[in-house]
Amino acid sequence: MATPTATDPAPPPISARSADMPAILGHGGPPPWLRRLGRISLTVVAIGALVYLFVPIVVVVIYSFNKPLGKYNYVWHQFSLDAWADPFKFPELKDALLLSLKVACVVTIISVILGTLIAMAMVKYRFKAKGVVGTVLVLPLTMPEVVMGFSLLTWFVALNWSRGFWTVIIAQVMFSISYVATTVRARIRGFEWRLEEAGLDLGAKPWRVFRLITFPLILPGILAAALLTFALSLDDFIITYLNSGIDQTFPIEIWTLKKSRIPPQINVFATTILLVSVAFALLGVYIGFRRSKKLGQLNP
């Protein structure tokens, strides 16, 4: 490679080369019609994605007001409030929904406690098996549910455990902990642990420091993890189906009923769950807005 000499002209400055870029690229990039086509294409794709996501939800809500001709609520026949007036017409649906809510509450409480402790340990402390623990936490997020469900079923059979409520709890906690730990870990990654040290230096007990300093700061991450865990537990089918006993959760009951009938009460329950989920989402947005507003007032 030739070395530059004193007689070689100096390269032009970066600003001069940047000024020549429009001439090289064609005076401002692509032509206007191509940019307009790109914007239109992006808009069409975005609208199509939204329609694909929300039209099934709208159909579920609309068909909760349907009075079907037969046993299957597939074809619109007549507007009616019968399903809303008597949502518990089928006792098996009510029992399945109550069981799903009970399972989801227990799984959420256990997973949030264990997942939060694991996340705090992963961020706050250094230990030799930290990489192994991180890998184990990621495995349930990437493993197919049928593989995890069947492996847990094999384990329960080997231990001679009767499948039922607690086997479902254990199975769901096994994959829910990963979601909680990942969510809370992302929240507390930038946490200032010196605040805890300052509280301890001032004479506060460790529990008081956690209650007054640590917990309020990581609470948004814990709430987000709790809502995610509750939704995943309520929705889970494969792992629950493989490890459940005689009693059936709501998704399993719907799958069983589809062989004989699809009553509009299913749409009523689905719409109710949707409205509750939207209410919690709006509440989270409101709380986040209030917190941002307070921080803005403290740091003008």
Name each model feature, range by range.
Residues 15-17, 33-39, 69-72, 81-92, ...:
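Interhelical loop and adjacent transmembrane-helix boundary motif
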Residues 25-32, 71-75, 81, 129-130, ...:
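Membrane-interfacial helix termini and adjacent extracytoplasmic/periplasmic loops
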Residues 35-46, 50, 117-152, 196:
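Cytoplasmic-entry segments and transmembrane alpha-helices of multi-pass inner-membrane transporters
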Residues 44-45, 50-57, 173-174, 181-185, ...:
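Transmembrane alpha-helices
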Residues 55-69, 99, 149-160, 227-233, ...:
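A structural signal for multi-pass alpha-helical bundles of membrane permease subunits
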Residues 97, 122, 139, 194-202, ...:
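Short hydrophobic faces within alpha-helices
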